[in-house]
């Protein structure tokens, strides 16, 4: 299917799901998700996709649906089939009216743990022909200061995972919205400015008693709020609290903090600088936005249950109806460092292959399809679940095996002279079944090639070996003068009765550095044609690796898994 045909399929489907109007960004994302090989040409294909999107948007709804059913009927069912595989029906869901969101904090790069709510929320929105929102929750410039580069990085990671979004928001640019609702809340008597010292407040809270500011008239509260907004209070001198139940069994729920002062002259926000000093907490901003953005279903981890309780008080004060909230169990990822703080301490950058960031996993060689499949298989179970490196590797192998070039690589190399009466030729396919092409090597009589020392030791015991796709050789010993092993030509055709090992070999070798994340880097000799490859390779008998570039005629590889 060419680019125009792919674009037509996904533009029609996107228009069908969204009232007849296709959006360019999600169509581009869908095209690249179906044909990842087009990613290097993305700048060239975007004008083509844009032209197709405009063409589709000029069609009537009836015409869009007719063409979609006639030419791409599978597009109407494929997303539903994917979703049914790992996700149960969504409660309180009405087709065409479901709206979900992914709300990352851009204080670090997107991690494997973040991928679960992103993938699941997106899948549900599309399964129910709804909408999906990307919302950056960046309202803490002090303790969770946003990384300027993380905004775009997260968007790139989502696109790579095959996730498109219909709406995009930045909470730091919605401060006036929050201030307006805060005033409304204060006027309704649902919030108040508290200037109690923290120790005094905690004592009152633990005793279930109100602080002196709680019952001040709304008019006085609004005057205090004006003073806070004018900068008359310093950091830590005042907070705004939402009135809840002072006898609530969970003390943290009692009159929780909705806004706090942050000195942005010392802690400027990367997008708004020092413009604002009063910043909403997670529960206020997230709760307000879920309502104003029309989010119908919030899917998040079980540790957010307390936040749901807090937000229920906010909604009650404002007369709003809560969205359907689904809490799934904890996800333990064995063999990965997921803590953002630990990754920072270790000095991991966003695409460090040792880190469990989406960028790191991508660079290491994990395919987006594998990550999606694993997360969908875990789903929204309320019980805790665990994913091991082996789980992810098994799914990844299913995806990449057909795309991985088979490469001969020799670690602990030893030279071997081939004693043959005439030149020998070998044609080796890059893949045994997938038609990825081949390469040819010609070996002259007496030419030296490189084998693994362990293979030569076994050849000594067995009397010989077979060089892959070349010929069978007898083991003739070691020439001390030349410092080479001697192998004598025996026959061309494969002869299983001999019981020889079939081993890899390298002629005119190039160097390769193989990085096993978390371990040492090792050196190997590889066949020269390997330096032209991109993407995945399978180092024969060793495992899969991702090409990480070529430097000074040396191939850099990141070892992936067996």
From Swiss-Prot:
Gene Ontology biological process: amide biosynthetic process; glutamyl-tRNA aminoacylation
Name this polypeptide is given: Glutamate--tRNA ligase
Keyword tags: Aminoacyl-tRNA synthetase, ATP-binding, Cytoplasm, Ligase, Nucleotide-binding, Protein biosynthesis
Family note: Belongs to the class-I aminoacyl-tRNA synthetase family. Glutamate--tRNA ligase type 2 subfamily.
Catalytic activity: tRNA(Glu) + L-glutamate + ATP = L-glutamyl-tRNA(Glu) + AMP + diphosphate
HAMAP family in the cross-refs: Glu_tRNA_synth_type2 (MF_02076)
Motif annotated as 'HIGH' region, chain positions: 104-114
The keyword Nucleotide-binding is assigned to this record: yes
Predominant location: cytoplasm
Function: Catalyzes the attachment of glutamate to tRNA(Glu) in a two-step reaction: glutamate is first activated by ATP to form Glu-AMP and then transferred to the acceptor end of tRNA(Glu).
Subcellular location: Cytoplasm
Recorded superkingdom: Archaea
Enzyme Commission number, as recorded: 6.1.1.17
Source species taxonomy: Archaea, Thermoproteota, Thermoprotei, Desulfurococcales, Desulfurococcaceae
A GO molecular-function descriptor: ATP binding
A cellular component term, taken from the record's GO annotations: cytosol
Keyword DNA-binding set for record: no
Short name of one Pfam family: tRNA-synt_1c
